[in-house]
Every structure is written in structure tokens, then in C-alpha cells.
Amino acid sequence: MTTDNQQDTAAAAVPTRSGFVALIGATNAGKSTLINRLVGAKVSIVSHKVQTTRAIVRGIAIHDNAQIVFMDTPGIFKPRRRLDRAMVTTAWGGAKDADLIMLLIDSERGIKGDADTILEGLKDVHQPKVLVLNKVDQVRREDLLKLAAAANEVVAFERTFMISALTGSGCEDVMDYLAERLPEGPWYYPEDQISDLPMRQLAAEITREKLFLRLHQELPYASHVETEKWEERKDGSVRIEQVIYVERDSQKKIALGKGGEAIKAISTAARKEISEILEQPVHLFLFVKVRENWGDDPERFREMGLDFPK
């Protein structure tokens, strides 16, 4: 017969593990979807548009005795603007700071373009690396095996996983491996914490996601959302004021929409999701302002968690 004290002693004897796992890949490979799947909650915005993740977002998951801190880095691509350069630099910096690197490849696209460039760049990164092939349910197994072999010829990956971030297939195997692979040590964060992103910033990211989803190709990436006011009210609700910054008057008209239709839809969708996360009523007020060349303002980069490139 085992007593409660004996069970507690046995549990205490199992060493805890913790570490940082950088998830890198080309834009739209499914990194944010996978992070949200592995963490079990929304910590990173998802849209069909590329380059939606701008800074490193940490999602925190507990699996067995391990605390796994995922770093959802911006997609790596050929930079053209100052903001692009900052995002790519941040992604590679996150990879080099991690205990382990997970390269996510879209199996449908294979190794070409940005994915090939990333593989070459990983040759100079000395952290342990694993390969994760995403969207495997859309590709023949024979082609998946060829893709895995080709990637492993370029970089010596410790393991190769085949998953679907959308359905969760194969994700449990990834978590089992990471929980055993990370170094022994105390947990970095409280057990109930799922992200180190401040709520004000997460709320702004949610609004930015709804902006992308609503406007599709109409609004360029020259937009930025800031939470300017956060008021906890006596009735238990929260009043949030956010500003959507764009670079030109023509972009402001697109964000507002005819008769304010677009901004109302964006506000409704964002308010609903923020309220669900906070588990309290939310009053969200959105304003659209023109700030010319905000993409060249060092202060805006700091607010996004990015270093300002020279």
C-alpha cells in the first residue's frame, strides 16, 4: 500500500526540466498556429497573411515534469524594408539564444526559396536542432520521406517530426521529446502562466490580427496597433482604448471602411476575443491615426520589442 507521503516523495524525486525552444521557419509555415496548439491557448496571432509575427512571443507549456518556453519568432525571409530587417535579425537572434531550435517547414512548399536559405543559415548555428514537417496530411508519404532526407542532408537534425499544426496530429510526440530533451533545472515561470507577453500588448496583437483578417490584401503592412489606455472599472469591466497607426490618409480610409463598417467589425471581433481571454466584459474603442513613416521611428520598434536597425 502506498501512502500519500510516499507518492509526494516519489514525485519530488523526479527532476524538473526547463528550457527555451526557438521555432523558426519561413513566413506562413504555420509557426504561430503550432505555438498556440502546443501551449493550448492563444499566445500568438494567426492570419493567412505573411509576416504577422513581428517580435518574439513566448508561449509557456507544461508537459510531464518539464516547462517548455516556446519562442515564436518572426518568419525569416529576404528583407526589403527596415522593419523587415529588424524582424529577420530578431528571428536569428532568438534561435541563437535558445536551448533547442525547431525548424518548421511547410511540406506542401518543400525546400525552396526562404526555407532553403534558412537551412543554409542553420549550418552556422550550434544549438541542437530538430526538423518539423507541417501539413503532412496534404502530402504523399513518399514525398514527405524525400523532403525529410533532403533537409537532413543539409543540416544534422537530432529528430524529424511529421505533424499537422491545424489538427494536432503528431504534436504529442513533439512535446514528449522536448520534455525529455531539455536540461534539468527549475521552472522559469509560475505554473499557471502561459505567456510573458503583457496583456496590453497581447490585446493590441489581437486587434492587429483582426485588422489583417478583415482587410486581407487591401491594407499594406504599414500599420501598427498600440494600446494607449487600459482602465479597470468598478463594475468589473475593462475599458481599452487603442490606436491603429497607418502611414497615409488613403490607408486610414481603408481601415475605417465605408460608413465605418470595417473598423466596427474589427472592434467587435477583437473585443469578443479579448473579453474571452480576460474573462470579463470589455469596452474597446479603436481610433485610426496617420503617422507618416512610423516604420522609421525607433520608438515604434521598441514598442514592438524589436531592435532598431541602422
Swiss-Prot record:
Positions of the UniProt region annotated as G2: 51-55
GO function term, MF aspect, one: GTP binding
Assigned GO CC terms: cytosol; plasma membrane
Any single biological process term in GO: ribosomal small subunit assembly
Location of region: G1: 25-32
Topological type in the membrane: Peripheral membrane protein
Entries under Gene3D superfamilies matching the protein: 3.30.300.20, P-loop containing nucleotide triphosphate hydrolases
InterPro entries: G_ERA_dom (IPR030388), GTP-bd (IPR006073), GTPase_Era-like (IPR005662), KH_dom-like_a/b (IPR015946), KH_dom_type_2 (IPR004044), KH_sf_prok-type (IPR009019), P-loop_NTPase (IPR027417), Small_GTP-bd (IPR005225)
Primary localisation category: cytoplasm
Subunit structure: Monomer.
Family: Belongs to the TRAFAC class TrmE-Era-EngA-EngB-Septin-like GTPase superfamily. Era GTPase family.
Annotated protein name in UniProt: GTPase Era
Name of the gene: era
